[in-house]
């Protein structure tokens, strides 16, 4: 486990994947009190407030001119993985509503990715743009077609 935290590029690639393809495309909460959003919008107590991590992960205003590009390097500063603020990168939500399984999911993703990378060569067959299928959690419409070959680990 301790070794996983030193795999900076792996963490950057996982976060970049979830920036573009978050596991939950949109979510909503109910306002506990009357409030005013930073842009001046009044939110009445009990109102549903919906946010869209899928759209936020692609916003040029938030991520820059290359917001639609898969670019793990955007997470690396001074050679190390640096996490963004929860409200810029809302995949795990933030504040008191932060996902309880966040750390466990990151360890699981890194572990599975390492096992797959070590044991298999994976090539995407069709490099067309992935399309989300509507639903509570993220699925790709039509799936992702890939060729998987076992690596020769005897070398």
Swiss-Prot record:
It is an enzyme of class 1 (oxidoreductase). Gene3D superfamilies: Cytochrome P450. Disulfide bonds: none annotated. Heme binds at residue 99. Its EC number is 1.14.-.-. The keyword Nucleus does not apply. SUPFAM superfamilies: Cytochrome P450 (SSF48264). Induction: Down-regulated in response to mixed metal ion contamination (cadmium, copper, lead and zinc), but not in response to zinc ion contamination. Keywords: Heme, Iron, Metal-binding, Monooxygenase, Oxidoreductase. GO terms for molecular function: heme binding; iron ion binding; monooxygenase activity; oxidoreductase activity, acting on paired donors, with incorporation or reduction of molecular oxygen. Its cofactor is heme. InterPro entries: Cyt_P450, Cyt_P450_E_grp-IV, Cyt_P450_sf. Belongs to the cytochrome P450 family. This is Cytochrome P450. It comes from Helianthus annuus.
């Amino acid at each position: 486990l301790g070794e996983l935290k030193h795999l900076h590029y792996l963490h950057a690639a996982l976060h970049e994947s979830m920036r573009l393809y978050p596991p939950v495309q949109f979510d909503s909460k109910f306002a506990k009190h009357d409030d005013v959003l930073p842009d001046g919008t009044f939110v009445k107590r009990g109102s549903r407030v919906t946010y869209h991590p899928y759209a936020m992960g692609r916003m040029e205003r938030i991520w820059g001119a290359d917001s639609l590009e898969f670019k793990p390097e955007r997470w690396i500063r001074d050679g190390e993985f640096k996490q963004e603020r929860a409200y810029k990168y809302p995949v795990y939500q933030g504040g008191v509503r932060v996902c309880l399984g966040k750390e466990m999911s990151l360890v699981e993703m890194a572990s599975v990715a390492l096992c797959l990378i070590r044991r298999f060569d994976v090539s995407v067959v069709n490099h067309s743009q992935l399309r989300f299928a509507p639903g509570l959690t993220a699925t790709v419409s039509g799936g992702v077609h890939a060729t998987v070959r076992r690596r020769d680990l005897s070398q």
